């Protein structure tokens, strides 16, 4: 089969590799769409892979073409997405249902062959069937949707509250949608891109705020009557938005860092004191899994995509490119700010 193989730093080659087979308990999927995740970019451009050669890709969808012995959950012909985590299922964290925290895990697309290929194989339990009314493009967005929902579930999310979403990338837009689905009073999305903020409004945000404006904080607080936001979800992983989260939080709020920082993070004593004075809870969120594995995050994504309450917009996708152009796709990320949205690598029939 053909695959986009990372053979060296900044070197992705579309080449022939051995085609995997479905062993007992596993399924083989013909890949239709595979998204480039932000975590894949440093793997290709900054020596971030675990080993060479490696096939990346962990946000994907396709059709089941082969099932191994004993498989009962899915059948040949099913349209599926895939949960990429392969937890050990034996450690204390796994036994307690905290699969994201497993220290002995493997992972499709970083520690073993991923979905930037004609085919990928995954355990039966990692295959998430979805309704044929859901497109393959949507199916490739299951993983970022589940990351967003996991953040809400980590914070005992309740409706009827004001919610701030910091960052208007794919995960930020999904976080906004989940907050709306579960009954928020008002959801406000913050970003520096008018294009992305327009997308957030189309997708259902109650208000959007461009943080490059001089008086954006006054505008943000006025929406809540000066009380601040009961839930603040930081999805950008940027130092300014992490500072902003502390300032936007209401008394007794829940502040959740979903975004992963890539620079040193420092707070002034005054900034940090917000947490003391407001007595808010600061929580991290990692990946997207719960018990029973892979978790309600995945089941609910399939359900709400099928009902149409979880929405998809062409604006999610920056560009669709053939799998054979993976090298060119990753090169686009070298221009700061160029890629707005998801790049999907697709296979021709």
PLM segments and residue spans:
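C-terminal hydrophobic helical "lid"/dimerization subdomain
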Residues: 3, 243-247, 296-349
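Short Gly/Pro-enriched turn/cap motifs at secondary-structure boundaries
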Residues: 7, 18-19, 51-57, 108-112, ...
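Glycine-rich beta-strand-centered segment in the early N-terminal region that forms part
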Residues: 20-34, 47-92, 131-134
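NAD(P)H dinucleotide-binding glycine-rich loop of Rossmann-like/cofactor-binding domains
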Residues: 88-166
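Mid-domain Rossmann-like dinucleotide-binding core that forms the NAD(H)/NADP(H) cofactor-binding site
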Residues: 134-214, 218
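Glycine-rich cofactor phosphate-binding loops and adjacent beta1-alpha1 units
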Residues: 155, 203-281, 338
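C-terminal substrate-binding/catalytic core of Rossmann-like NAD(P)-dependent dehydrogenases/reductases
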Residues: 221-222, 226, 265-317, 328
